[in-house]
Amino acid sequence: MLVNMKDMLDNASRDGYAVMAVNSVNMEMVRAVIEAANEEHFPIIVQMGVGQMSKLAHADDIVPMVINMAERADVP
């Protein structure tokens, strides 16, 4: 599920848990990170740096795919 990051972090702060931001450099990593979050029932932040995006993938291509994968996830 795709959620507002501020809301997710506010919930984590209020309830006393951390949210891991995972630096993902390709779609295989994004898929693995989201699958692991689903299996563990914990929210995550999929992180991609501007430098990585400029060298490894174009934002116009990868952002819609990441959003689609996040929307299908069972966890934020």
Q: Model-flagged regions — what are they?
A:
Residues 1-20, 39:
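N-terminal amphipathic alpha-helix/helix-capping segment at the start of soluble metabolic enzymes
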Residues 3-4, 24-28, 57-64:
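Conserved active-site and cofactor/substrate-binding residues in soluble primary-metabolism enzymes
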Residues 7, 11, 32, 65-68:
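Alpha-helical scaffold segments in soluble metabolic enzymes
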Residues 20-21, 53:
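Short, contiguous strand/loop micro-motifs
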Residues 23, 33:
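Conserved, mostly hydrophobic/aromatic
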Residues 29-31, 53:
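A broad, structure-centric signal for solvent-exposed, well-ordered loop/edge residues
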Residues 39-76:
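Active-site cofactor/substrate anionic-group-binding motifs, chiefly glycine-
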